[in-house]
UniProtKB/Swiss-Prot annotation:
Family (UniProt): Belongs to the DsbB family.
Presence of the UniProt keyword Disulfide bond in the record: yes
Segments passing through the bilayer: 14-30, 49-64, 72-89, 145-163
The protein's role, per its UniProt record: Required for disulfide bond formation in some periplasmic proteins. Acts by oxidizing the DsbA protein.
Periplasmic side: 31-48, 90-144
Subcellular location: Cell inner membrane
GO molecular function, one term: protein-disulfide reductase activity
Gene name linked to the record: dsbB
Species, as recorded: Shewanella oneidensis (strain ATCC 700550 / JCM 31522 / CIP 106686 / LMG 19005 / NCIMB 14063 / MR-1)
A single GO cellular-component term on record: plasma membrane
Name used for this protein in its record: Disulfide bond formation protein B
Amino acid sequence: MTAFTRFAHSRVSWFFLTGSAIALEAAALYFQYVMKLDPCVMCIYQRLAVFGILAAGLVGMTAPKYRIIRILGVLGWAISATWGLKLALALVDMQNNPSPFSTCSFLPEFPAWMPLHEWFPAIMLPTGMCTDVPWQFIGVTMAEWMVVAFSGYLVVLLLFIVPILSGSNKPSLYK
């Protein structure tokens, strides 16, 4: 087993995934509550995608020696990062090509059985407009930075997918 595979099978690798998602969520809350930048519906959906990556990291951390746990973690990671990238690209398009016919809704469209914007309004209730660009860093908007972040998650996933999925189904009791 290579060092790369051993790292992929360790809790530390999944901790880094979880920690990066926590850092992104903390940054989002900093922008919202300290810098007073209102999140739009697409921002809330992206926030949910980051929570999906966080959850995938927590799943992977539970028992990374077991292949089934790693597979579940990878699936959550892949689905959340892909969905987040799709949302971030759509938001960049909305901001770069504003149209009165292409707007986002005022309330998120969560399922009736899971109204996250009602349960957690401090985190999941949108208060901004999708076409607003209230912040830039080195000429790159927040939506464009999220394209970078989700693309980064997918690149790391591609680097790690073979080592994560390789190896035994369960750890040996005799090593």
